[in-house]
Amino acid sequence: MILITGGAGFIGSNLVAALSKKTGAPKITVVDRLGIDDKWKNLSNHLVHQIIEPENLDRYLSENDESIEYVFHLGAISSTIEKDVDLILRSNFNLSLSLWNWCTKHRIPFIY
């Protein structure tokens, strides 16, 4: 299985599209918030195994550590007008660090 954070964004959804078109493509799990700016539309024509919210990532990783083969980390708050610094820190730094540590511990390729 391939895990793609930010999989509903522009780059992430194009990666999902490219990977899902490959013959024998592995299952793809997307980590993203779909309600923001109708990002769900970016995935509407692509085959996705599962979609999880970033807040549930740690639990998902612990429950699926045997099946994840690669992690593409494309998720971040990219808004230039976001004013909640704590949210930016949690989403852009803490989540990245946590994911990096998990990948290192489990020897999973981390593509950033």
Task: State where each predicted segment sits.
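Glycine-rich phosphate-binding loop and adjoining beta1-alpha1-beta2 segment
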Residues: V30-L57
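N-terminal Rossmann NAD(P)H-binding glycine-rich loop of SDR-like oxidoreductase domains
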Residues: I2-K22
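Conserved Rossmann-fold NAD(P)-dependent oxidoreductase catalytic core, especially the SDR/UDP-sugar
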Residues: Y70-H73, S98-Y112
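Conserved active-site region of classical short-chain dehydrogenase/reductase
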Residues: F93-L97
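Residues at the starts of beta-strands that form the adenosine-phosphate
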Residues: M1, A25-K27, P109
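NAD(P)H-binding glycine-rich loop region in Rossmannoid oxidoreductase-like domains
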Residues: N45, P54-S91
